[in-house]
Amino acid sequence: MKQKIIITLWSALFLLCAFTASAADRPNIVYIISDDQAWTDYGFMGHPHIRTPNLDKLARQSVVFERGYVPTALCRPSLATLATGHFAHRHGITGNDPSPKYAERGSELYNQRRAKLISYLDQFDTLPELLAERGYLSHQSGKWWEGSYKHGGFTHGMTRGFPERGGRHGDDGLKIGREGMEPIEKFVDHAVAEKKPFFLWYGVFLPHTPHNPPQRLLKRYKEQGLPISVAKYYACCEWFDETCGQLIDILEKRNLRDDTLIV
């Protein structure tokens, strides 16, 4: 029997509180998660160089919590916490990969330990699973370490996952944003056609390495005399912001913005 989770994240708690409304009032939910970005590296947080106009506008329209902390500052444990509402000491996913100290990478034992890590998610009801009980369709894009998107309870998604080749932490999901937003557009149109509320997990692989931003963005930061490595990172932060603007445009063009919570 899965443990019923207690949502401790302020965002998830806030979202679940909205579900006391009638079915007709269920909001769509968009969960935006940047990757390897310092909390200071946004215009609305006062960064002197990085431009994030789309998120700045969103921040002006939103409640902003400026003091957030994570006990396990790694990608996979943090995403597992967002999906389950439990900290790493509860869900058991405390690292990105099995330790090579105990099994050689690529060995059968290593793969067994990796499968064991993925299975830890089975202890809990995930946020997409809870939303599905309330009639939501859900879509995964971007980073996802826990196997196929279906393993997280998403009804739709991009990540094929373990044990398929290339399924370590996102495979096809890592293309979102960097190579366009078409999978999200198709999903939103599908949800609208089905007359279902939807949940979007937008875990875009930005501004994470590789720092290969469009030249038009990189040029802006190189002209400020910044070291090239810094200029590339700053440009990737702005690139992330651009994709968030594209995501919001998808909602606005379909008249969905007023019926959507963006976290």
Residue positions per predicted region:
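Positively charged n-region of N-terminal signal peptides that target proteins for export
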Residues: 1-5
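Formylglycine-dependent sulfatase
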Residues: 8-12, 19-263
